[in-house]
UniProtKB/Swiss-Prot annotation:
GO molecular function: structural constituent of chitin-based larval cuticle
The organism of origin for this protein: Araneus diadematus
GO cellular component: chitin-based extracellular matrix
Taxonomic lineage from the root: Eukaryota, Metazoa, Ecdysozoa, Arthropoda, Chelicerata
Purpose: Component of the rigid cuticle of the spider.
Alphabetical list of InterPro entries matching this protein: CHIT_BIND_RR_consensus, Cuticle_Struct_Prot, Insect_cuticle
Protein name: Adult-specific rigid cuticular protein 12.4
Domain of life from the UniProt record: Eukaryota
Domain Chitin-binding type R&R: 9-87
């Protein structure tokens, strides 16, 4: 394993590399209240993952390999492809005018009609 450290006037630098199969390494430098650096390791799939970071008044920010590993991401995508999908939404139907029944008693309504002889133009309805 390699390791180094430097301190000077409130600033520092350090780093290490394990040099083994885990591939762990780290480098960092900083001053009072802030730091920048990176670290690396070999994950369970054999992939080297490296993260760069900074920390200071704006908080901790990491970039690089900060998500899930590619094997887990591929397995999740395969599972999502097998998941049931919602059926497509039906097309909206055209509006239909409502059917409003007519009131009883208007001419032409259902019922019985009797035409009385001798009374021209008169019909009784009941």
């Amino acid at each position: 394993a390699d390791m180094g450290m430097t301190l000077a006037g409130g600033a520092y630098n350090f780093g290490f590399n394990t040099g083994d199969a885990t591939g762990h390494s780290r480098v960092e430098s900083g001053t009072a209240g802030s730091a920048v650096g990176s670290y690396s390791y070999i994950d369970a799939n054999g992939d080297r993952r490296t993260v760069q970071y900074s920390a200071g008044p704006d908080g901790f920010k990491a970039t690089g390999d900060v998500g899930v590993d590619r094997k887990t991401a591929a397995a999740a995508a395969a599972m999502a492809a097998l998941a049931p999908k919602a059926p497509p939404a039906p097309a909206p139907a055209a509006p239909v005018a409502p059917v409003v029944p007519g009131a009883w008693g208007y001419w032409g309504a259902p019922g019985y009609s009797v035409i009385l002889p001798g009374l021209a133009g008169y019909a009784a309805r009941w």
